[in-house]
């Protein structure tokens, strides 16, 4: 299986995040991708290539131009005002505040407009890192368009919490959605996205919620007790043309392979019935039993079984890296999914 990777991910590294009332080093750190890359190489998964540059146009298919301009220029504006630390929002358009404009012109106001939490710090290298992460996804997608049955986009920062015009949860650009749209623009009639990250892919859901050319299925922690709290419930089935194309599987804290795999089986049945031309996997491995910010109980061998079950769908499959914060195990678990898939797909 071909993997696509860029060293540019190291340009983004937030100084700290607020966890349980305390500032601590960010869980979303460069060593995550470095560890996965090392495992890809040690297991001889296949060739590793650098991304091509497809420009901003594929990003603009889903992300607002003003939002991209903001992300690209925010750090320069921040430092021009005399600041040096991470740029993090502190004010958001909550209940009974205006959300439909006008967009504030002050930097902190505009940042709050485009953010839904404090977990997406902008640093000096953030734009280049997130831009390259999207190009990683697009390069892997192009490899599949040229005939490959699978590919792995080792994206960092992750993307599934990012919407068309908002960021949060470590995410700025939605890599999985961008690659999905590229499949459609190049002739696919339908594409399915299966999000196996511990946290609900609220950004991906929002982007495709009213469309019938993308089926979205997500297996995640119950939002009643788990981030992102305000989306990811089972009754969210899509709207308008997209009604019936959104499937959420919220699971309780402590869920292990038995409950998780039952949800996977149901999601796979729905995906098979949808008959997509391609499948995109938002590959988060923060479902691992020792992940520091998650509450599921999957073990490393379970990720082999996950890949095997996905392979039985018999679909061209693009894997896009999302979460996973147990750094010592992230490479083993992510590559186990890929090896499980490859072993069953032969």
Swiss-Prot record:
Site feature (Polarizes the scissile carbonyl of the substrate) residues: 325
UniProt keywords, alphabetically: Hydrolase, Metal-binding, Zinc
Annotated TM spans: none
InterPro entries tied to this protein: HDAC_PDAC (IPR050284), His_deacetylse (IPR000286), His_deacetylse_dom (IPR023801), His_deacetylse_dom_sf (IPR037138), Ureohydrolase_dom_sf (IPR023696)
MF GO annotations: acetylputrescine deacetylase activity; histone deacetylase activity; hydrolase activity; metal ion binding
SUPFAM superfamilies: Arginase/deacetylase (SSF52768)
Stated name of the protein: Acetylpolyamine amidohydrolase 1
Taxonomic lineage: Bacteria, Pseudomonadati, Pseudomonadota, Gammaproteobacteria, Pseudomonadales
């Amino acid at each position: 299986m071909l993997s696509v990777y860029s060293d540019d991910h190291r340009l983004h590294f937030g100084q700290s995040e607020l966890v349980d009332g305390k500032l601590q080093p960010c869980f979303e750190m460069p060593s995550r991708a470095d560890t996965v890359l090392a495992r890809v190489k040690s297991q001889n998964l296949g060739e590793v290539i650098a991304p091509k540059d497809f420009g901003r146009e594929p990003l603009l298919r889903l992300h607002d131009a003003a939002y991209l301009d903001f992300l690209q220029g925010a750090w320069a504006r921040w430092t021009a005002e005399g600041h040096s630390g991470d740029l993090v929002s502190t004010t958001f358009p909550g209940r009974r505040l205006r959300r439909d404009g006008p967009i504030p012109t002050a930097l902190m106001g505009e940042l709050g407009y485009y953010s839904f939490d404090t977990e997406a710090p902008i640093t000096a290298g953030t734009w280049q890192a997130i831009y390259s992460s999207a190009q990683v996804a697009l390069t892997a997608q192009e490899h599949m368009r040229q005939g490959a049955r699978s590919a792995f986009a080792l994206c960092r920062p992750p993307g599934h919490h990012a919407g068309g015009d908002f960021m949060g949860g470590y995410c700025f650009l939605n890599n999985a959605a961008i690659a999905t749209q590229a499949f459609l623009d190049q002739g696919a009639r339908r594409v399915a996205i299966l999000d196996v990250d511990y946290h609900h892919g609220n950004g991906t859901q929002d982007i495709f919620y009213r469309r019938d050319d993308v089926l979205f299925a997500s297996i995640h922690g119950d939002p009643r007790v788990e981030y992102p709290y305000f989306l990811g419930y089972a009754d969210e089935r899509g709207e308008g043309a997209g009604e019936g194309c959104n499937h959420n599987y919220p699971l309780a804290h402590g869920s292990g392979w038995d409950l998780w795999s039952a949800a996977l089986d149901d999601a796979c049945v729905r995906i098979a019935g949808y008959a997509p031309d391609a499948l995109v996997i938002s590959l988060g491995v923060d479902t691992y039993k020792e992940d520091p910010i998650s509450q599921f109980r999957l073990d490393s061998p379970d990720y082999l079984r996950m890949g095997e079950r996905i392979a039985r769908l018999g679909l061209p499959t693009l894997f896009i890296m999302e979460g996973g914060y147990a750094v010592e195990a992230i490479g083993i678990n992510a590559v186990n999914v890929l090896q499980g898939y490859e072993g069953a797909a032969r």
